[in-house]
C-alpha cells in the first residue's frame, strides 16, 4: 500500500514522502492516527511538484548563502574596549556584538547563532571565528580586540588561550 506521509514518522520518513508500507501498518496505525493518507495518483503528482519546487528554492538559497560566504570570508572586525589587569576586558565581546559589527561591515544581516563562538571573548587579542551558514559552508572572520588608548597587547588567539590556561 502506498501512503503519503502527512507528518514525520520515526523510522519511516518525513512529511511529504511517499512510502510503500504493509497494508496492516497503513490501515491500523498510519491512517487512524492521521499520520498518512492513501497515495492516489493526484496526490503523488502534487507531492512530486512540491518536492521539485522545494529543491529549486533550496538551490537558490544555497547560492545566496555562497555569495554571503564570499563577502564574509576574511573580514576583520575591530573592537576597542576598556582593559584591566593582564589584558582582561571589562565586560566581553559576544556573538551578538560580532553579528552587529559584521552587519555594519558587509551590509547584510547574519544571525548571531550562526557565529561559532564557544564563549564570550574576555581578553585582548586576534581571534579567528567561523560563521556556520550551511553544513560545509563556514567562512572565517578575524576579530581584533584592543584596549582603549592602545592599552593591552594584541596577541594571536592561541597565545591568549595559553596565557588564560596558565592563569586558571
From Swiss-Prot:
MF-aspect GO terms: rRNA binding; structural constituent of ribosome
Region (Disordered), start-end ranges: 148-168
Compositionally biased region (Low complexity): 157-168
InterPro entries for this protein: Ribosomal_bL9 (IPR000244), Ribosomal_bL9/RNase_H1_N (IPR009027), Ribosomal_bL9_bac/chp (IPR020594), Ribosomal_bL9_C (IPR020069), Ribosomal_bL9_C_sf (IPR036791), Ribosomal_bL9_N (IPR020070), Ribosomal_bL9_N_sf (IPR036935)
Keywords: Ribonucleoprotein, Ribosomal protein, RNA-binding, rRNA-binding
GO terms for cellular component: ribonucleoprotein complex; ribosome
Cited NCBIfam families: L9
Family: Belongs to the bacterial ribosomal protein bL9 family.
Reported function: Binds to the 23S rRNA.
Name under which the protein is recorded: Large ribosomal subunit protein bL9
Top-level taxonomy: Bacteria, Bacillati, Chloroflexota, Chloroflexia, Herpetosiphonales
Gene: rplI
Amino acid at each position: 500500500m502506498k501512503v503519503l506521509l502527512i507528518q514525520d514518522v520515526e523510522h519511516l520518513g518525513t512529511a511529504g514522502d511517499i512510502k510503500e508500507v504493509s497494508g496492516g501498518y497503513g490501515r491500523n496505525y498510519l491512517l487512524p492516527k492521521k499520520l498518512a493518507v492513501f497515495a492516489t495518483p493526484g496526490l503523488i503528482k502534487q507531492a512530486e511538484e512540491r518536492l521539485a519546487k522545494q529543491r529549486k528554492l533550496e538551490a537558490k538559497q544555497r547560492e545566496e548563502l555562497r555569495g554571503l560566504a564570499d563577502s564574509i570570508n576574511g573580514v576583520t572586525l575591530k573592537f576597542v574596549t576598556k582593559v584591566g589587569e593582564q589584558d582582561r576586558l571589562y565586560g566581553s565581546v559576544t556573538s551578538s556584538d560580532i553579528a552587529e559589527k559584521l552587519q555594519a561591515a558587509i551590509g547584510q544581516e547574519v544571525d548571531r547563532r550562526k557565529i561559532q563562538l564557544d564563549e564570550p571573548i574576555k581578553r585582548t587579542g586576534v581571534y579567528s571565528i567561523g560563521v556556520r551558514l550551511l553544513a560545509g559552508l563556514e567562512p572565517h572572520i578575524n576579530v581584533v580586540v584592543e584596549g582603549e588608548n592602545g592599552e593591552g597587547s594584541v596577541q594571536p588567539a592561541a597565545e591568549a588561550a595559553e596565557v588564560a590556561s596558565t592563569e586558571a
